[in-house]
Amino acid sequence: MKNSEIVVKRFLLSLAASLAMAFSAHAGEVSVAVAANFTAPMQKIARLFEQDTGHKATLAFGSTGRFYAQIKNGAPFDLLLSADDETPARLAKEGLAVDASRFTYAIGKLALWSKQPGLVDAQGQVLQSGTFDKIALADPKLAPYGAAAVEVMTHLGVLNTLRPKFVQGENIAQTHQFVATQNAQLGFVALSQVMADGRLVEGSVWAVPAALYTPLRQDAVLLTKGQGNAAAAALMQYLKGDKARAVIRGFGYEH
């Protein structure tokens, strides 16, 4: 190798190292409370966010109702990705979130799902037949998807008939687990939990018509503890970008 080539190679390596150090020096961290239904999409988005910006997103997943209580009690989250639009608005009204930062990052879809192929039909008639022992849903007091499930069953006139068969999860992730482990033969889950790249992962599903429940408009909001955090501001902006939107669509959400 010629001396000139060696010099150029060393220069490029030095430049790359300098850029990496500068990138790292400006990287920050953001703590995010994420609605359980958005677990898989957010994990993917967080990886892309870190690759593209150098910022790290630390994620916690759970029910929106539980996060609301934790934030009220001083939990150190910078952002909330809620399963509804009411909780971010309430936090803003109570001075715990920045009202102007609120935006809808996804519109969720409810699904009736079974791990067993053929059990759930494309029209959801299985709810009328009742040919199952247990049906799972998220706690409607804590989880918007659970409240939506109750709306659907009420609309179809099967709520009281099916109530003795309920298995309730604290959040939609636990509800999905009940069905995935077949502790319940079927259950109301987020469509995003059983979809990947626009296709059903396994089992059988009824994508519940949107007319049967109040729209699951999911809002993100910057919490007051996150004000001044550059990584938090960057993630809020990233969620509106093309890469994040493509991920969100791939998991069956609208936005």
Label each PLM-derived region with a short phrase.
Residues 23-27:
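Sec/Tat signal peptide C-region and signal peptidase I cleavage site
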Residues 1-8:
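N-terminal secretory signal peptides that target proteins for export/translocation
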Residues 28-61, 65, 69-75, 82-85, ...:
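Exported/periplasmic ABC-transporter solute-binding proteins
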Residues 12-22:
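Bacterial N-terminal signal peptides
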